[in-house]
Amino acid sequence: MHALIMQKVYSSGVWQFEGDVYVPWGTSGASVMQIFGANKPHASTVMLPVYDGKLTYYHNVTKVLADRVYDRWMRLNVVHDVAAGNVAVFVDGERRLDVQGHGGKEHYFKFGVYTQGLHNHSHRMEAHWKNVAIYTKP
């Protein structure tokens, strides 16, 4: 299980993460992206795991952002407005989620693949990323 961390820590402004992610069939119970940093009891503002071929929000397997995500490239955009305290998630250009963040003073983007042990996870943990970019509006 590997995850990349964008080393830029931010505490204000509007920040956008974008990239193309490919999740092979058989990967389940794996988070592919998160915005780290939040007030306790949370560790992250947003977490996007894949369960049974569905991109979900946190560990809520009923909060599906995209279905049939296996074996295809998917464009993911995540916009975090720190002052407003909200996050928008776009999948393939379509707005799929608007949520309040979980606070926190410092944040950073983390992406790749890492296990989430709250539901049965698969032995296969794999995700491929390309065209990753970070944008900011101070």
Identify the meaning behind each predicted range.
Residues 1-54, 136:
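Secretory/extracellular carbohydrate-interaction modules
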Residues 54-77:
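Short, aromatic/His-centered strand-loop micro-motif at the edge of beta-sheets
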Residues 90-94:
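Short strand-turn-strand beta-turns centered on an Asx-Gly dipeptide
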Residues 99-134:
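Flexible glycan-contacting loops in extracellular carbohydrate-active proteins
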